[in-house]
Amino acid sequence: MAPNTAVEVQSVGGIPTAVAGPDVHRDITVKWFLLGAVGYFLIVGIVALIIAAKFVWPDFLGSIQYFTYGRMRPLHVNGMLFGWLLGADMGLAYYIVPRLCGVRLWSEKLGVATSILWNIIILSAVVTLLGGYQKGLEYADLPTPVAILVVIAWVMFGVNIFATIATRKYKQMYVSTWYLMGTILWTAFVYLTGNFATLLTTGVNQANLNWMYTHNAVGLIFTPAGLAVGYYFIPRASNTPLYNHKLSMIGFWSLAFVYVWTGAHHMLHGPISQWLQTNLDRLFGHVADPGLGGGLQLHRHHERPVASVQRQRLAQVPDVGNGVLSAHVLSGSDAQPALGERDRLQDRLDSRARAHGGDGHLLIHCHGRRVLCDSANL
């Protein structure tokens, strides 16, 4: 088959979903989100400098009501959360998931529409927060109408990502896909709690819900998204296999079941239920599990030596673009694996080879041996 010949890709259910070829991933949505995120990071960084200057010169821009500290700080916090961090995470999810699934993004138009709505949300936040319209809750300052727009945008994002995963070419899912799915589900729960449930109560209960939201905004939104990005790009950039996929999944489930309880540490020894403080004490030590597991993964896979001949082959084997996956055992000889071995190898590629995604070549472990795999447009 010619290198640039397009091949129809079938979904899990046998439904044609994409054409595997040089231009299988258009990445229009990715560019919109990432460019916007970088732009907001620079702008909000300037806001941070103005806020810092106010600590030294309290009267700096103090005569302008829109630039008072009480309005600038919520703008900085929410700008970094939604404009920079969450916008960048969404853009990277649009990049990673189609490549790990071997198909195009389910709907590029829906992705672009989500990006447009996201920018409308950021601009609305700027106008309302500087205008003094806010709820006065940490991380949940946005007025309710703007918060509703965030929910709508997140539903659009989640539908696009989950639909892409549902039409994936590969049955098994790499850990980055798990973390991104978790991010979508956990964000929905955390955001609804912090921005809407807090409005239904007052006093200590409201404070408890608010700190649950602020803490888990870091641990159940940005942490899993960051781990997904690291698990994808670090093995791919270093061209070495993931150390242990099961270990990464232990970290995933630890994050899922443990982290949500630890938000109460913001009110430790305060007027909250004793049982909540007790659970916090017992579970807090396990918060480090996902980070330690990820750190061990990304450290240990660098310790695996790759023979110089393997490195030379990695550099010399040309890219292929025909959508066909082939394998060559890198041993002392050039012997090819038997046909049955190739079939078993291809069945085992989905969970680990997807770590490197993209076109090029994948270095993985199979049956205790290093294997070089040609992979096109995955």
Which residues fall in each region the model found?
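Alpha-helical transmembrane segments
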Residues: H299-R311, L345-Q346, C373-L378
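Hydrophobic, small-residue-rich membrane helices and short re-entrant helix-turn-helix hairpins
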Residues: K169-Y174, Q206-N210, A237-S248, W275-L276, ...
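Extramembrane terminal tails and long inter-domain/linker segments of multi-pass membrane proteins
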Residues: M1-V30, L61-I64, H301-S308
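Helix-boundary and loop/linker segments of multi-pass membrane transporters
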Residues: R26, R71-R73, A307-Q310, L349
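Hydrophobic cores of alpha-helical transmembrane segments in multi-pass integral membrane proteins
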Residues: V30-V56, Y69-V103, E108-G132, T144-T164, ...
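N-terminal juxtamembrane segment and adjoining first transmembrane helix
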Residues: V19-L35, T167-V175
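Non-cytosolic membrane-interface motifs at loop->transmembrane helix junctions
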Residues: G136-A147, Q172-S176, N205-Y213, I272-L283, ...
